[in-house]
């Protein structure tokens, strides 16, 4: 059977959580000999929609955080399992084109980590236009607005403790599967800290702070860097993964050109090695990055989130001892430096990450989907 993995691509491929999660899931299916295709759902709406959506997303998260936060709150208020939102009807507009593509290419399973394709597939199934198995992967540690107005066969959620929230929002309990959020196998096969540092050329006799800014360099990275440099000594090196934000990287490189312990790096495919090498990690609380950090078992400090679902990510991680954070930038830095200087606290955090993390989620997702397919085929033969 064939699997179609549908995302909403709003950043360059390999830099967005949705894209990464589907790439990871695709690898697991292909290991089992199951062909897959990745698709950007808005390509079915128009050729320009994906690029436009990407620009709007970047503007809303970098330039208009308050607007984004307000929209998220409004979404929670108007979202309902019974009444359909404008989001639902907007995604219904291209659903027929999506339906034709799925039918013509013979796909019988659709996997989605984003609301938009889930809304479109819901419309198709309500109109009885398409008979395929559908699966939604939640990519944050909360039930995001409008999830409850979707109707798919199963919802893969990050943790069983979140089931109550999804049920309260209207998702049937029997449709919830607490697999975790899929992460790459690279995070499951990490070298030790010393070996990772040797591979990356990081001093083995210094403290190492890793800062991940996100693919767009979101957040007040310049201020945080200045404060971390000011409050640490020559025995502490700071490695900044600058993502695709060229302006940010140039600013930092110019400012710290004469500071040998500040290293500003371009987009890298070796984030897993940097996590393995680091003593502590400062990162924005995205669902995938946070899950990767737990899989890597690195002491985790969450910076100020994008308003909305990332606030819920911080709450889940801090309540379970898997990260520390603060209400202000200064509080975040102070908690991070305290963690850096406390090996026992780091060890305790790793124990919590071991207890609550689900590093084998990608395998669990694929195994569940394959199991459902096999069960359906067996039932059909009996009939």
Segments and roles (model prediction):
Residues 276-286:
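Acidic donor-binding loop of glycosyltransferase active sites
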Residues 345-359:
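A short, well-ordered alpha-helix in the C-terminal region of glycosyltransferases
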Residues 153-215, 245-247:
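A nucleotide-sugar donor-handling region in carbohydrate enzymes
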Residues 193-195, 202-278:
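Donor-nucleotide binding loops and adjacent catalytic segments primarily
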């Amino acid at each position: 059977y064939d699997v179609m993995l549908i995302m909403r691509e709003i950043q360059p491929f390999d830099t967005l959580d949705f894209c990464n999660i589907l790439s990871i899931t695709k690898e697991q299916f292909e290991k089992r000999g199951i062909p897959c295709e990745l698709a950007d759902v808005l390509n079915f709406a128009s050729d320009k929609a994906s690029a436009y959506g990407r620009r709007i997303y970047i503007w809303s998260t970098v330039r208009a955080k308050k607007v984004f936060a307000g929209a998220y709150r409004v979404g929670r208020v108007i979202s309902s399992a019974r009444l359909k939102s404008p989001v639902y009807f907007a995604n219904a507009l291209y659903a027929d084109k999506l339906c034709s593509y799925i039918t013509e290419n013979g796909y019988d399973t659709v996997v989605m980590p984003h609301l938009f394709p889930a809304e479109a597939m819901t419309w198709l199934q309500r109109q009885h236009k398409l008979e395929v198995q559908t699966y939604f992967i939640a990519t944050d540690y909360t039930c995001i607005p409008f999830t409850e107005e979707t109707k798919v066969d199963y919802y893969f959620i990050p943790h069983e403790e979140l089931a109550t929230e999804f049920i309260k929002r209207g998702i049937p309990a029997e449709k919830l599967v607490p697999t975790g959020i899929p992460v790459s196998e690279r995070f499951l096969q990490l070298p030790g800290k010393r070996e990772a540092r040797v591979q990356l050329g990081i001093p083995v006799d210094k403290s190492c702070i890793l800062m991940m800014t996100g693919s767009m360099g979101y957040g007040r990275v310049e201020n945080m860097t200045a404060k971390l440099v000011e409050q640490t000594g020559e025995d502490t090196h700071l490695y900044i993964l600058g993502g695709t934000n060229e302006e940010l990287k140039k600013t930092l490189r110019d400012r710290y050109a004469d500071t040998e312990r500040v290293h500003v790096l371009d987009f890298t495919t070796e984030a897993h090695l940097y996590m393995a090498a680091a003593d502590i990690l400062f990162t924005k609380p995205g669902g995938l990055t946070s899950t990767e950090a737990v899989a890597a078992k690195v002491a985790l400090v969450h910076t100020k989130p994008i308003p909305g679902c990332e606030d819920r990510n911080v709450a889940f991680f801090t309540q379970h001892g898997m990260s520390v954070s603060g209400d202000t930038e200064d509080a975040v830095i102070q908690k991070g430096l305290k963690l850096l200087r406390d090996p026992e606290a780091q060890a305790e955090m790793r124990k919590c990450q071991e207890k609550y993390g689900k590093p084998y989620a990608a395998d669990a997702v694929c195994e569940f989907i394959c199991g459902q397919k096999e069960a359906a085929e067996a039932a059909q033969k009996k009939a």
